Amino acid sequence: IMTAVIGPRDDGVISCDSMSEEFEPWKQELGENIPSGENWLAWLELLGEPTPHWSNYVMGSVRHTQMFEDVRYGFNMSITSSIPPDSGSSSSSALAICGMFAVRLSNQLDTDAEVMTYTTAEAEWFCGTRGGMMDHATMMYSRDDSVLRLTFNPFSQQAIRLPKEMSDVKFATLFTHPSKKGSEIKRAFNELAFVAREVVPRLVPKNWQDNWENVAMELPEKMSREEIVNRWPNECKMFEKMYPTLFDINFE
């Protein structure tokens, strides 16, 4: 569980600390590095990847909100968390959600679950990852007595109440290795996102669900960079902008 104690401010300062000694306190100003334009991905491309720091997950939410909303006030935020960091258990997404709640509550902006899900998923790209919004949707829509059914493209969510016979059942996730998003892990993470979001949808037919077993058998096990360039030459510039850690050499 991650808990955030949030205090609105009447100035543009953002001040955050953690109860864990591993994460040092920090402060930033709303007026520093204000996003320009109306295209989040284009601004991130100009900005480049920030130096790794836990503040990035909060400031990604702040900067994304600044691009699309009227943000005048900062906030104080103190974080307490039992989610093990660098474990693959979505501590980074939880922190981004806390940051999004903080900036939106402090500026009296909408905190509807769907708004929070979409905006925070994009905001986390500030850190260099290009993940989707499953973690964020799970955090916003989960219920204590239910399992959550999510679909994407189009997005839908449904909380399915557990039967009484399962009221005492506990679910646990086991992690076998660390997931610190350094350069190699981040590249592998973004590669999975790229394959799932860009490659597979371009390879399967429209009604693939009707014959998914045969469709799956026909998918290639791997594709080289050259095969991707040759197959979708008109998409390469977009790939390069969206996934710079994968395509750090120009396609030209």
Question: What is each of the regions a protein language model found here?
Answer:
Residues 3-56, 64, 146-252:
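C-terminal nucleotide
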Residues 42-51, 81-89, 123-128:
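A short glycine/serine-rich beta->alpha loop
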Residues 67-76, 103-119:
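Phosphate-handling active-site elements
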Residues 110-157:
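Alpha/beta catalytic cores of group-transfer enzymes, especially the acyltransferase/condensing modules
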Residues 40-44, 62-63, 67-84:
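Glycine- and acidic-rich phosphate- and metal-coordinating loops
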Residues 1, 89-109:
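DPxDG-like acidic metal-binding loop motif
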Residues 10, 20-22, 79-85, 103, ...:
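Acidic, glycine-rich active-site loops and adjacent beta-strand->loop/helix elements
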